[in-house]
Amino acid sequence: MVLAELGGRITRAIQQMSNVTIIDEKALNECLNEITRALLQSDVSFPLVKEMQSNIKKIVNLEDLAAGHNKRRIIEQAIFSELCKMLDPGKPAFAPKKAKASVVMFVGLQGAGKTTTCTKYAYYHQKKGYKPALVCADTFRAGAFDQLKQNATKAKIPFYGSYTESDPVKIAVEGVDTFKKENCDLIIVDTSGRHKQEASLFEEMRQVAEATKPDLVIFVMDSSIGQAAFDQAQAFKQSVAVGAVIITKMDGHAKGGGALSAVAATKSPVIFIGTGEHMDEFEVFDVKPFVSRLLGMGDWSGFVDKLQEVVPKDQQPELLEKLSQGNFTLRIMYDQFQNILNMGPLKEVFSMLPGISAEMMPKGHEKESQAKIKRYMTMMDSMTNDELDSSNPKVFNESRMMRIARGSGRQVREVMEMLEEYKRLAKIWSKMKGLKIPKNGDMSALSRNMNAQHMSKVLPPQMLKQIGGMGGLQSLMKQMGSGKDMMGMFGGGDK
């Protein structure tokens, strides 16, 4: 999860109010001052922070609140709402449609990670069932075509470019025409970048845009520039019809919050954020789930979406049926470990689970957790079918554990540790017994069927306490809206 430190500081500021006997003006000001410092240190502009602080004070009028109101919860809701408002440009971006050719043109300054982002964007849509293709119209930077070619080949995405042609407009037009004939429904044009905003860059962008008539122009921006993103985004918007922004390198800079809020202030929707060098370190940016994860509240619908990507559609009904029965076997644990490893970076996956802030997984711990999962799977590979399909850990006597340890090259104590993890997960799984399963076995509908009662059973006690108990859980679910919006958090709430 990006901006983990910022999210941790805001969350701690809210939690400190739990230690206060009476929440008065002084307690509220201390909380808001800490949040203000955290936002300013993340390079969010002072006017935006000041406006947010003022709005929260207007919403949370402590003198007007009747006795019996949960002031901490009302303050938390106001903070959530204002953070969403700060990051939301209030304008949706163009979304490509399958089986209909869409041309998307990428623009940006050199060094922002534009070419890599083009491939990530193509790869993301390829996983969603699109037929993407890449066109290299960057004739300015030496090695640009080689880089795009290498990335595209690795991701198994068709590409077009030239080592001899120097006219970017000609390459762009030929590439787009070629892929339209091949029935590609998402044609991505990578254009030249520059070291600074100069007239020749903007003129070339205008010419390529005029010739290819893109459905969407995406501006790629480096997050390290912080609130300076406002001027940069405005400059590009005035030169070409920028319809969306992708912010890169969000994993390595403290100024990401400033960049996000600055771009939102230009009314340009941020559609993705780059969180690392790898192909799957690329997240859809959706304001409510993002803020929810930032504050350690999770993003249940995002988790279900990722799970859907790795669980074949024909296997989803069977998995949901097992979930409703509450019968957890080692084979199910093995399959779910495999799914988790396929879902992308563990830090990102865990931040989608309510009550888990990204700060809870320190840097370097992700690899350790991944290695542990793989060790457990190696041990399970040494089990018999009967052992894997048993839901009774008592079948694992000393001789069986020694056999599994020898077969997997591990210690007996490690086998015992793996079985303890199994018992812990089995306990959580059993609490899902009786969950209403969608008739068509669609996992996305699972979110709508989960109410606060189910979620409170699944969450570990310390996480539930962090959210504010049962009342806090219900309140947070309501914050995300009702109906479709409810999926942005935990799924359907109590009616």
UniProtKB/Swiss-Prot annotation:
Location relative to the cell: Cytoplasm; Endoplasmic reticulum
Keywords assigned: Cytoplasm, Endoplasmic reticulum, GTP-binding, Hydrolase, Nucleotide-binding, Ribonucleoprotein, RNA-binding, Signal recognition particle
Enzyme class, UniProt record, top EC level: hydrolase
InterPro entries assigned: AAA+_ATPase (IPR003593), P-loop_NTPase (IPR027417), Signal_recog_part_SRP54_M_sf (IPR036891), Signal_recog_particl_SRP54_hlx (IPR013822), Signal_recog_particle_SRP54_M (IPR004125), SRP/SRP_N (IPR036225), SRP54 (IPR022941), SRP54_euk (IPR006325)
GO molecular function annotations of the record: 7S RNA binding; ATP hydrolysis activity; GTP binding; GTPase activity
Keyword field contains Magnesium: no
UniProt cross-references to Pfam families, sorted A to Z: SRP54, SRP54_N, SRP_SPB
Gene Ontology biological process terms, A to Z: SRP-dependent cotranslational protein targeting to membrane
Region (M-domain): 296-495
PANTHER family from the UniProt entry: SIGNAL RECOGNITION PARTICLE 54K PROTEIN SRP54, SIGNAL RECOGNITION PARTICLE SUBUNIT SRP54
Family affiliation: Belongs to the GTP-binding SRP family. SRP54 subfamily.
Subunit composition and interactions: Component of a signal recognition particle (SRP) complex that consists of a 7SL RNA molecule of 300 nucleotides and six protein subunits: SRP72, SRP68, SRP54, SRP19, SRP14 and SRP9.
Domain notes: The NG domain, also named G domain, is a special guanosine triphosphatase (GTPase) domain, which binds GTP and forms a guanosine 5'-triphosphate (GTP)-dependent complex with a homologous NG domain in the SRP receptor subunit SRPRA. The two NG domains undergo cooperative rearrangements upon their assembly, which culminate in the reciprocal activation of the GTPase activity of one another. SRP receptor compaction upon binding with cargo-loaded SRP and GTPase rearrangement drive SRP-mediated cotranslational protein translocation into the ER.
Name recorded for this polypeptide: Signal recognition particle subunit SRP54 3
Source organism (scientific name): Arabidopsis thaliana (Mouse-ear cress)
